C-alpha cells in the first residue's frame, strides 16, 4: 500500500507553484524540467527522450524553430506547463497523483498527448510525485510503492552499442550484461563495472583505441559488423573478469523496427524474412548465455512475437516498441501470448499513473517488468525509485559509465542501504 491517496484535507499539501524550464539532456538537446512547490515540500523532475522511438508513443512537443537548437527547442512545452497546466493544478492536493494525471490528460484532449506535449505532462507528473514524497518526508520509492517496496532489480547494462546508438555496422542496438547471480545490488553493480572495464581492454587490444569510444548510453561502440563478434567479446569479458555464464547473462535489444524494411530484416549483411530471423535468434540463444531479447521484430509484428515467445519459452522476450507502455497494446499482447515481458518507459505513455497501470497489468499476467531509461537522459533518478516501487525484476539504464546513467545506479545503492536488512535483490 502506497502513500498515494491517503490525504486528509490540508492546505499544507496544496500546489502553490509550478515552474518549467528548458534544460539540456545527455545528447545536448533541449528537454523539459519542472519544479512543483507546496508549503511543505518541493519536487523537481527532468524528462528523457528516445533515439529509437515507437510510432505509438506519446508525443513529445518540439518547437520546430530552425533558428533554435535545430528545431528541437521545447519552449512551447515549457510555456504549456507554466500557463495552461499550472492554472488548472494550483490549489490541488499534491498527493492526489491520479487525479492530477487524469486532469492533465483531459486538458490535452488527444490520445498521444500531442497538444500539451508528453514532455510537458510527464515533467509535471514526476515532479508532483516528488513534491508529494518530500511533503510527507518519505523517500520517493516508499511514497510510490508503500510497504511492498523492498526489492532491488537486476541491472541489465548496455555495455556494447550498435544500431541507432552507435556509428558501427551492428544491426542489434544493445548488447547487455546482467549480473543476476549477485546477492545484492551493491555486488551486482561491482560485477557490471568490472566486466565493463575488462571488455574495454579486450576491445582496445583487438580493434584499437577508437573501439572504446562510447555511444549514447555509455556502452562501447567498436567497428563491428556481425552480432557474433559482439557476443564473443561479451562472453570473453565475463570469463576474464572471473565470472561464469550462470552468474552473468547477456541481454539483447534488437530494436528490429530500425532494420526492418520492405518486409525484410537487414542484419549481419543479409536480408532475412521473419521466420529466418526467428531461426537466427534461436541459434544465438543456443550458442550464448542469452537471458532476454527485446523487440526482436518490427513493432506491429504481434504474431512473430508470439511465435518466438513460444519457441524460446524460457527466454525473456521483451516488448518495448511493441507495447510502448500502453495498456491497450499490452492487453493485446497478453491475449495473444506475444512476448512475456514489458519494458516500462514512463515517457512512452506520459504519466506516472498510466505507467503504474501498465506495470500492474503486466505483473498480474505473469509478465516480467523491466524499467528503462531513454538514450537521451538527465541526471533525474525517478526511474530508479519507480523500479523499486513496482517491484520490477530488472532495470535498464545504460553502462556503468556517464553521469546520467550512473545517477540511477547510485540511487539504487542508496535505496538498498536505506532498506537495510529488508532489502531483497531479485532472483531471476
Curated annotation (Swiss-Prot):
Domain of life of the organism encoding this protein? Archaea
Q: Does the keyword Membrane apply?
A: no
Q: Does the keyword Magnesium apply?
A: yes
What transmembrane ranges does the database entry give? none
Annotated (2R)-2-phosphoglycerate binding sites: 173, 345, 374-375, 396
Q: Which GO terms describe its molecular function?
A: magnesium ion binding; phosphopyruvate hydratase activity
Q: Which amino acids does the record list as binding Mg(2+)?
A: 253, 294, 320
Question: Which Enzyme Commission numbers does its entry carry?
Answer: 4.2.1.11
Q: In which pathway does it act?
A: Carbohydrate degradation; glycolysis; pyruvate from D-glyceraldehyde 3-phosphate: step 4/5
Q: List cofactor names only.
A: Mg(2+)
Q: What is its main location?
A: cytoplasm
Q: Which Pfam families match?
A: Enolase_C, Enolase_N
Q: What catalytic reaction does the record list?
A: (2R)-2-phosphoglycerate = phosphoenolpyruvate + H2O
Task: Keywords in alphabetical order, please.
Answer: Cytoplasm, Glycolysis, Lyase, Magnesium, Metal-binding, Secreted
Q: Where in the cell is it found?
A: Cytoplasm; Secreted; Cell surface
Q: Tell me the function of this protein.
A: Catalyzes the reversible conversion of 2-phosphoglycerate (2-PG) into phosphoenolpyruvate (PEP). It is essential for the degradation of carbohydrates via glycolysis.
Family classification: Belongs to the enolase family.
Instruction: Please identify the protein, giving its name as recorded.
Output: Enolase
What is the organism field in this record? Methanosarcina barkeri (strain Fusaro / DSM 804)
The gene designation is eno
Amino acid at each position: 500500500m502506497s502513500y498515494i491517496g491517503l490525504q486528509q484535507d490540508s492546505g499544507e499539501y496544496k500546489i502553490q507553484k509550478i515552474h518549467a524550464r528548458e534544460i539540456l539532456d545527455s545528447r545536448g538537446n533541449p528537454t523539459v524540467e519542472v519544479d512543483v512547490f507546496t508549503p511543505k515540500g518541493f519536487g523537481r523532475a527532468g524528462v528523457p527522450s528516445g533515439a529509437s522511438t515507437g510510432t505509438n508513443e506519446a508525443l513529445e512537443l518540439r518547437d520546430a524553430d530552425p533558428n533554435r537548437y535545430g528545431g528541437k527547442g521545447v519552449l512551447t512545452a515549457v510555456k504549456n506547463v507554466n500557463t495552461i497546466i499550472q492554472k488548472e493544478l494550483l490549489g490541488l492536493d499534491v498527493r492526489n497523483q491520479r487525479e492530477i494525471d487524469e486532469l492533465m490528460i483531459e486538458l490535452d484532449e488527444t490520445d498521444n498527448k500531442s497538444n500539451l506535449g508528453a514532455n510537458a505532462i510527464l515533467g509535471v507528473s514526476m515532479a508532483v510525485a516528488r513534491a508529494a514524497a518530500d511533503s510527507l518526508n518519505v523517500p520517493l520509492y516508499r511514497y510510490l510503492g508503500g510497504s511492498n517496496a523492498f526489492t532491488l532489480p537486476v541491472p541489465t547494462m548496455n555495455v556494447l552499442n550498435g544500431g541507432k546508438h552507435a556509428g558501427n555496422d551492428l544491426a542489434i542496438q544493445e548488447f547487455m550484461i546482467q549480473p543476476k547471480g549477485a546477492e545484492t545490488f551493491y555486488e551486482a553493480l561491482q560485477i557490471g563495472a568490472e566486466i565493463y572495464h575488462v571488455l574495454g581492454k579486450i576491445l582496445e587490444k583487438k580493434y584499437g583505441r577508437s573501439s572504446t569510444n562510447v555511444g549514447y548510453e555509455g556502452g562501447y561502440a567498436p567497428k563491428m559488423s556481425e552480432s557474433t563478434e559482439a557476443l564473443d567479446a561479451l562472453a570473453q569479458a565475463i570469463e576474464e573478469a572471473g565470472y561464469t555464464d550462470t552468474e552473468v547473462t547477456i541481454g539483447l535489444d534488437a530494436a528490429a523496427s530500425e532494420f526492418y524494411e520492405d518486409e525484410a530484416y537487414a542484419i549481419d549483411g543479409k536480408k532475412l524474412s521473419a521466420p529466418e530471423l526467428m531461426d537466427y535468434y534461436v541459434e544465438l540463444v543456443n550458442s550464448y548465455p542469452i537471458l532476454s531479447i527485446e523487440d526482436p521484430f518490427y513493432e506491429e509484428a504481434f504474431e512473430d512475437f508470439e511465435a518466438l515467445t513460444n519457441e524460446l519459452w524460457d527466454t525473456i522476450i521483451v516488448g518495448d516498441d511493441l507495447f510502448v507502455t500502453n495498456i491497450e497494446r499490452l492487453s493485446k499482447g497478453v491475449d495473444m501470448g506475444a512476448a512475456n515481458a514489458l519494458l516500462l518507459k514512463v515517457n512512452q505513455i506520459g504519466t506516472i499513473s498510466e505507467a503504474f497501470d501498465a506495470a500492474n497489468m503486466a505483473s498480474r499476467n505473469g509478465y516480467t517488468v523491466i524499467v528503462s531509461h531513454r538514450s537521451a537522459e538527465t541526471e533525474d533518478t525517478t526511474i530508479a525509485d519507480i523500479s523499486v516501487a513496482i517491484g520490477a525484476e530488472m532495470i535498464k539504464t545504460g553502462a556503468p559509465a556517464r553521469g546520467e546513467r550512473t545517477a540511477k545506479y547510485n540511487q539504487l545503492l542508496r535505496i538498498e542501504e536505506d532498506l537495510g536488512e529488508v532489502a531483497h535483490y531479485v532472483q531471476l
